[in-house]
Amino acid sequence: MKIFIDDGSTNIKLAWLEDGDVKTLISPNSFKPEWSFSLLDDAAPANYEIDGEKFSFDPLSADAVVTTETRYQYSDVNVVAIQHALQQTGLKAQPVDVIVTLPISEYLDANNQKNKQNIERKKKNVMREVRVQGCDAFVIRSVAVLPESIPAGFSVLAGLEDDESLLIVDLGGTTLDVSHVRSKMTGITKTWCDPNIGVSLITSGVKEQMAVHANTRVSSFQADNII
């Protein structure tokens, strides 16, 4: 099975085909660096282990690992977040082929060519084994990597005339990716990325204000809900 994954810094977005229908899922990133437990027998905690490091999904933990930075793309918690999202699909754990993303600033080098080192680093990271407490884990069989923002315009670009183009602006959780793409994906005229502009700036501001004025520490997930 092939699963398309936009593994952004704030949410993991999945899309896959099931019985001919397109299914989608959004899974927020909120993982603390320890396991959790549940008092309910039928509510198993979402506990994961990778290379001896333990993580658990906890949307309310103010101590959740920070994911709104570029290094998240190659981190333990990135792999855990992908596995957690796969576990939420309702699909039986199985080997899967995935397509993931990198910010344009990571996908391209200074000469606007594919940064093969970063792409290979991303592939190796995503393919690492994750153990899931109490159930089987999905096994990543193969990984392909695409740049953020550009795939969003595939369907529109296919219908453009030869002398037309599309400007794609992707304001994500951590980065702002902009691409000027020629009709039918015949070429990319210009790309630009600011790795320091994202909606997490607003989330961080809300968390700071809650801590200062309400004497309350909240998670990024809670701050997003407040917004």
Regions of interest found by a model, annotated:
Residues 177-179:
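A structural feature that tracks compact, well-ordered secondary-structure segments
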Residues 169-173:
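Active-site-proximal alpha-helical scaffolds that flank and shape metal-associated catalytic sites
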Residues 1-168, 185-200, 221-222, 227:
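Nucleotide/phosphate-binding catalytic cleft detector across ATP-hydrolyzing
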Residues 203-205:
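RNase H-like, metal-dependent nuclease domains and their acidic two-metal-ion catalytic environment used
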Residues 10, 174-175:
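Gly/Ser/Thr-rich beta-alpha loop segments that engage phosphate groups in nucleotides
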Residues 182:
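A cytosolic small-molecule/anion-sensing beta-strand core signal
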Residues 208-227:
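A mobile "lid/hinge" subdomain adjacent to the ATP/sugar-phosphate binding pocket shared
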